[in-house]
Amino acid sequence: MCLELDNNLSDYFKACTYAYYSDYENFIKYYDNEELFDEDDLNFHLCIGIRNSYNFAVKMENSGLKLTSGILSSISARYIMSNKVCDFNFKYLPSGIWYPNVPTKETCIYLLEKDPKYSLVIKTICVLLGWDDVCDKCDKICTEVCFRLSIIFNRRSFCEEDTIYNYKIHENKNILEKVEKDKYLLPETILRNKDTTLEIFFKYNYTSKQSNIEQIIDDMLYTYIDYSQNTEFGPMDCVSVDKSVYYNMVSYKPYLDININTVEFNFLNSAYVLKHHKEYPDDLCKKAVLNLLVNDIYDSNFVSLYRPFYFYTYKTLNKYMVQKLLIDFPRQRYAILVNYAIMNITEDLENYSPDIDLIRIAYASGSIEFYNIMMNKAKKEGGMCQHLDFENEKYIFKYHKYEDVDFDNLHKNNGHPLLLRATHLNFP
């Protein structure tokens, strides 16, 4: 990667930045070996860089550095999510293999046949995506978070007979602690507190209290769809890295081909395309703007020039970004509200018509309050609208009478929309 950063930045900041962007050569140039064990931020950004790049994971495995267990677990996860299973995966069992993308069913079945312990992590994918055929091949074990998700997503049969464990990685060892079902794991209690579970699982916080602080990301069976909200880590959070690079990039030469996928899923390529936007087609610039928005960068000039159709990608927009976009671009409000449907945010829903796609996405995301509000409005008004043509990326308007809606198809849950947007091909 040919990314040049301002000389006044510290070597430590540069090491974290290059790790975050999966740039092995520059990471090696600026890091201090001792910091792999002492610095939380560096571990955190290494784990992100590894999960986002198969090539970076391979280089880190073969670097000769003494790596923390969280980093080793992230390398194992990246191999699996790229469907490149090897002996390494059976030495280091990852704690999460669904972020930033999921492996194929064939990869999951192969892992289960080779090592039944993979039931712990694959069962969670089954719950998220409704893979009942793969779930049948898993052992009757799951994690507490997976059990809670099975209740929230109305897939109780996936886990109802399972023995529940808390699972973590400590000093390169897999530690299982059996969890007894108590009143806090009763379905009614889980549903009453489902927002907390979804908040933990999908959006927030690598900074939970840990017995071994060096394991920043991968020591428990938690992984988060929106890792931009790492606010408790101070100045080295993801948002500050992205913003610093975007506004202070001295020069950059893309190391990946510039195309729809490498722009939508690679922040540096997005920044590069917009800095040379007159040389690229509008569709590519729209993907670049989207990548900036989900990384909390609102460049009003480019948002106005290249307004995307989709307003979510491998992560959702943060709540405040959604509110700003709703004010600035009211005609795109239903596309923007997809983020609320995914995150179960119900503010001001009374101001919007019930929308068939938002209802479907809310159902698939387990966003029950959002779903119920929209459905109740549809019943009261006698129908629901359709504002989005996802296939052709166009805004439309169609009205469906309530009695004409095919609710069996509407409630067909094909998995969480964020997970289904990404494939391993986007993570070189």
Swiss-Prot record:
Positions glycosylated per UniProt: 8, 205, 344
Entry annotated with the keyword Oxidoreductase: no
Record-annotated disulphide pairs: none
Keyword Glycoprotein: yes
Key words, A-Z: Glycoprotein, Plasmid
Domain of life: Eukaryota
Miscellaneous field: The presence of the two linear plasmids, termed pGKl-1 and pGKl-2, in strains of Kluyveromyces lactis confers the killer phenotype, i.e. production of toxin and resistance to it, to the host cell.
Function: Not known.
Protein name: RF4 protein
Record organism: Kluyveromyces lactis (strain ATCC 8585 / CBS 2359 / DSM 70799 / NBRC 1267 / NRRL Y-1140 / WM37) (Yeast)
Lineage: Eukaryota, Fungi, Dikarya, Ascomycota, Saccharomycotina
